[in-house]
Curated annotation (Swiss-Prot):
PANTHER family: GTP CYCLOHYDROLASE 1, GTP CYCLOHYDROLASE I. Zn(2+) binds at C90, H93, C163. Pathway: Cofactor biosynthesis; 7,8-dihydroneopterin triphosphate biosynthesis; 7,8-dihydroneopterin triphosphate from GTP: step 1/1. One of its GO terms (biological process) is one-carbon metabolic process. Homomer. Keywords: GTP-binding, Hydrolase, Metal-binding, Nucleotide-binding, One-carbon metabolism, Zinc. This is GTP cyclohydrolase 1. One of its GO terms (molecular function) is GTP cyclohydrolase I activity. It comes from Streptomyces griseus subsp. griseus (strain JCM 4626 / CBS 651.72 / NBRC 13350 / KCC S-0626 / ISP 5235). Coiled coil: none annotated. InterPro entries: GTP-CH-I_C/QueF (IPR043133), GTP-CH-I_N (IPR043134), GTP_CycHdrlase_I (IPR001474), GTP_CycHdrlase_I_CS (IPR018234), GTP_CycHdrlase_I_dom (IPR020602). Its EC number is 3.5.4.16. It catalyses: GTP + H2O = 7,8-dihydroneopterin 3'-triphosphate + formate + H(+).
Amino acid sequence: MTDPVTLDGQGSIGAFDEKRAEAAVRELLIAVGEDPDREGLRETPGRVARAYKEIFAGLYQEPEDVLTTTFDLGHDEMVLVKDIEVFSTCEHHLVPFRGVAHVGYIPATTGKITGLSKLARLVDVYARRPQVQERLTTQIAESLMSILEPRGVIVVVECEHMCMSMRGIRKPGAKTLTSAVRGQLRDPATRAEAMSLIMAR
């Protein structure tokens, strides 16, 4: 069983309850007027429950789980990983939003850095939860600041939200950009350098 985690200090949640999720999906199918016992839907509740277990796996991880490996290389210039794929779920409508994240930091004066893949894994920890893009962006930045203790952090997330594309206002292709900037990267010149690297194609 996965240990419970605490989200934003608002209490803990336990391990994923696959049977309960399966029963809930079955009830949802009935609620929308479908027959969950017909051939095409008979296995759907189980499939959806297993999919949700994967999609929301970040609920049962902490950033410390992925930022475990650090190196003291004496590198004191910016480290930036661009175009990290983001797949997340809007907590308001439980439909996907997807796009890319750009994550950069200026290492501490000790030169402590983490593996590049760890930055992508950190994005996944927070993306694989019911989310809003603004909080996702902030959580990534705050985790890097608290765990790596760098001199500065910048996180830019650019996503298309299916809740805007397939329902409501129905504007497919519209993208939302959010950013979180901490420490020395708030200096206008340093921030401009980071943004020029992020926006370069």
